[in-house]
Amino acid sequence: MAGLAQHIQLKYIFGMNNEIRNSLQFHDEDRIIYPAGYNVVLHDLNDKSQHYYQGTNEYRGISCLALSPLKRYLALGVKGQRDPAIIIFDTFTQKRRKNLGLNLGNLDRYNIKQWVSIAFPSQNQETKYIFSLSGAGGDVVLCWWWHEKGKCLGSIDLGAQNDIYEISFNHSDANSICVTGNNFFGIYAKIEGTYVREDNQQKQKPSVQNGENSSAAQLPQPTLNIQVSAGNNNQNPQPEIKLENGNLISNLPADIVEKNFVAHLWMQCESYLVVFVESGEIILCDSRGNFLQIMEQSPRYFIVSRSGMIKIVAAVAYSKGFYVACSESIVLQYHYTQDNDKNPFTCVNQFKLKQFVELKEIEIKSICMNKAEDKLLIGLDNNQIYEIKIKPYHPETVNNDSSEDREVTLINHLNHTGPINSMDICKRKPIIATCSTDKTIKIWDYEKKQIKISWAFNEEAFCLSLHPQGFCVAVGFLDKLRLMNLCIHNSQNTTKNKAYKEISPFKGCKEIKFSNGGQYFAAVNSTSSNHVIQVFKFFTGENPSQLVFKGHTGRVKCIAWSSDDSFLLSCGLDGMILAWKLDQDFQHQQTIVPRIVDIHNKGVNFSGLTLTVDNKTIVAVGNDRHIHQAVINEQQPVDKTDKKLLDINLSCLAFPSSNKLLFAGIQDDARSSGAIRCFIYPLTHGKFTDYQAHDERGVEKMKITNDDRYIITAGKDGCIMVFEIKDKDARGMKLKDGYAKYSEEELITRSDLDDLKSTRDGLIVQINEFSNQNAMIGLNSRDDRIRQLETQIENNSQKRKQMFEQLLKSKTMEEQKLIQEINEIKEQFEQEIQVMDTKYQKEVMSLVEEYENQKRLHEIENNKNNKKKTKLLQEHSQKLQIIDDQYQKLLEEQITQKERVEKQINHLQKEQQEVLMQISEEKETEIKNLNQKNSKDEQAITDQGLKAKSDISITKKKIMQQQQEAQDLKEQKQEYERQKEKLKIQNQELRDKIDGQKKIILERDRTIGEKEKIIYNLKKKAQDLEKFKFVLDHKIKELKRDIVPREDEITKMKQETNNMDQYLKELNAYNNYLGTVVDELYTTQETMKEDIKQQRQQISVQQVKISRFKDDVYSLAQHILDYDKLVDETERLFMKHVNDKEVKRQSVEGDIMMEYRSQKKNLEKLVNMFKKSLQKDNQIHKDDKIRIMKDNVDLIREINTLRKSIKDITKGQQSNIPDQKGQTQHMPLQTPQLSRKSISQPVLPPISKSAMFEGVTQQNEIQKSHTQINPELVEEKQKVLNSLQTDILELQKVYEALNYEKHNLTQA
């Protein structure tokens, strides 16, 4: 029921939905669009503000979205309980424009479950038309809408059985449409014609043939002909949709046909269609869909993945190329080059998002680019959005946009990636606490709209509750409870976020709640059969026996405290609502706390419960579509509830302090799931309003802030939504009570406090030093600065005067020039006006003459038409006279015939009367004779009548039985006749079917004969191919003979690489030895640091003593004239500062100095040894590098000769193809032989990324240790290691090239 004023308004959303395809889009240069719940968020990148496009109450969630090319319209595909729809918004006004449902077109014959993709045509047609594509388990239907008038102009079933992903329009031709999906790729053409409307529709399902394609696949191309009738009086013509066969893609390889086509792009630079396959291939087609090539620089061919295969996830186009997002967060940039026809798009940039984001496992879900092409937005699977600033690519320069220069910024927050299990808010601070299935706990600030703390755990947190002061949070895990502090420096996963108290074992805690005062917290301990609510004392951690409440047999879904913490309420899936009174005096008297509410409702699964502000009424909801109300009576337990029927299921409830409104979250599979319903309380009014919030998965938790300003909801879609309450009375009550503002205190640990104090003291010292320095510098340079400024002012004034004079002169000159130009322009305009007047006058005269000529022609034609009319009228009158004469003759003939028939009738009547007279006379005589006979027979009959009466009664009974049997037989006969008629009809239908089957059999016999002929021809071709195969086998054997010695050479090379590996292992062992030495030095350094700290502390103490001693000496000097006082003061000073009577001098032990010198000598010897070993290693590596470079040159030469030989072999094979007569021409094969240099070349095996990473980390550790010893040694060692890395990489490239050539030879 609607008709109420708006009580809440959406203010902010934490979260997004990355399951929707192409969920990220630029609205303009500073605003982006992404879905969140059942809303589309318009996010400003500058001020972080949000605006929203909200769905309607008739539907439940968003399945797809699309922006028009001019960003004028936003189309949302929404899910419904039965049928989906498309909602179109005006982006200028942010209001809903149209709602396109299935009832607007003849779409009831399809099984449409939801819309998968929406596309707007080009800029000229976006205000009228829109195309939509359905899928997700139902029929795959392509629909054409006229959204300006809300009509469906046409639809067609594509017949695809797999998932369909995307639909789009060609930029240059708005009539061509491309559809891609899993094992589906089609191009459709929209043709508007002037044909007469027809009722029949032709359909054909385009399918990808699996087993019938050979090396070149040809698929059927569906062409969508939408023909609208023109010249008809009907204002709403219905379209006619047809499919025609054609070639979709020609020469497409067979292994690509059955792939998953993830995305496609219509390029702006040239008329290319780029199609992306999930397995990493990029297909290049022309604008008609004809296959051109598979790009050589596809990600599959040059990117090495950890999982073994790279996957393409998303793509976006720009003016001169496109970006491709792949798995493992890899982004590639392809640029268009005009001169290269073979490879028009080349990969010019490549980077990984993991280089800029400190996340372990991330995958890209969506990608988009702004119109200026300087910003790239990337959406990740963890619901985060990153903005990357991009520089334009210039082929003249090298390293245009290196990864180090990229600016990467996080746009949104660290959102949850799974459904939210629990949520709670704080009374004294504007914070929200949430836990999710992604094993994280997050603390949000809804006033500053930011995240404060994010923790990650190894196990899932099921529930949590915030302390009213905001310094602590209680979290329930699978087998324990944890109490954790919310500290300032506790936002990361460090050792500081450990719980300060842990309660275990505590099984399956799904609900936990702090009391309003914070002195208690209640938690549910769930075992296999019992569900016990335990109340703990927060400050002591005790759980008294009288605060253990039993009674639930199923899962407890909600716990609530009264406002004064005197009642504890609970409800669960067992259909029970229980309440206990917490009284301190009463608890000490008895060990068992009685229940004040004990309600049992079998078959009801309660999910939410709340109390009114006066603590008198309980309101609960469950899955029975009712609201249950119960009034608390402390004297007598309550066991019944008052029910109010609803049309949906509710999941959670919340009351503001005014008690005038009741907010409820909807979680219903039928309708309106995810919305917030606002009731007017009391519920007898029956008025409510629904507000859209989350998607169809429903609302999980709902809370109202302590000042009644906001209502906060959390859903299973992972989003947190903040709504502002518009009810002024609710906030007025809290303001009258004098409610304080939020507290500004923060919790901090002692170690953090010490660090802050030390940093503060250091900064104060630095400030004092800088202030003193600045004061001294200022006093010295102030006068000089004043003089310089005075001279600058004078010089500037003179320069400005000169500039002003020059500007005046230039101004006068420009004014004169402008006046002259204006006069010239006026003259030109006057001349042009005169010329135009003369032209228009001539044109008008010519038009007048034409008009008069047309008038004359019109009069002549009228005269001719009048003459024709008179002739036609005369001819018509003559024809009418002829027809009248003919019909008059026919009438006369019919009249004569009528007279003859009447005469015959009269004659027959007379004869009939005579016959009747004779019959009457004969009857009279017969009657007289019969009377006489009857009189005689009457007496005999009377005698027999008495006897016959008894017989008659018997016969009557028999007759009645026979009549009944006769009626039954008649009814049976009628039924048999009906069955006979049905059998006749069936017989005729069967005969017709037999005739049709005979015709089909004849047609199939014909086709079988034709196919047998085809098979015979194919067998002939197969025999020819076998002959050709025999020749190729012979050639392959010859090639294998040549390959064997090359394989031997490769084995020798592998042995050499193994030797190199052993040498590298020795180097690693030497590096490890150096690492141990560095660790020992590091430990000595730490001990030295500790000694330095102690010495500094002693120095500070001594300085304090010295300052105090100076003060005492100064006070003693005041009494230098008075000898007695001077003696007393000196004695006092002696007693104060001299504790020991004898002062001993400290002397350094000689053994310590000897050990120190010996250690110094040993370290110097080690340094000299390291220098010598490094010099030797440098010389060895230089020689190896020179030798390896020479071998690489030889290898490159050999590879070039092998490539030339492979090309000659392929040309020879093409020339050996059999001609029509079956003859072949053999070409001699020449295989190059490897040189002896290639045998001795060292080639390393491929090195894994993990080994490379471990080596780099070891090198970094060694470098850190060496910096403490000698910087010159570190630089030399680093140069050697860098040269080794480059050598290894070069050898790895050579090894990969050899494997590639070997693979080509084996294929040839």
Curated annotation (Swiss-Prot):
InterPro entries reported for this sequence: CFA-57 (IPR052993), WD40/YVTN_repeat-like_dom_sf (IPR015943), WD40_repeat_dom_sf (IPR036322), WD40_rpt (IPR001680)
Segments annotated as WD repeats: 57-99, 110-154, 415-454, 504-546, 551-590, 645-689, 694-733
Keyword flag Coiled coil: yes
Pfam family, one: WD40
Principal location: other
Entry-linked SMART domains: WD40
Disulfide linkage: none
Keyword annotations of the record: Cell projection, Coiled coil, Repeat, WD repeat
Subcellular locations according to the entry: Cell projection, Cilium
Gene3D superfamilies in the record: YVTN repeat-like/Quinoprotein amine dehydrogenase
Coiled coil regions in record: 779-1000
Domain of life of the source: Eukaryota
GO cellular component: cilium
Family, similarity comment: Belongs to the CFAP57 family.
Functional description taken from the UniProt entry: Associates with components of the nexin-dynein regulatory complex (N-DRC), a key regulator of ciliary/flagellar motility, and might act as an inner dynein arm (IDA) hub or linkage.
Assembly mode: Forms a heterodimer with CFAP57A. Associates with components of the nexin-dynein regulatory complex (N-DRC) and the CFAP184:CFAP263 complex.
Protein name stated in the entry: Cilia- and flagella-associated protein 57 C
Species in which this protein is naturally found: Tetrahymena thermophila (strain SB210)
Gene name for this UniProt entry: CFAP57C
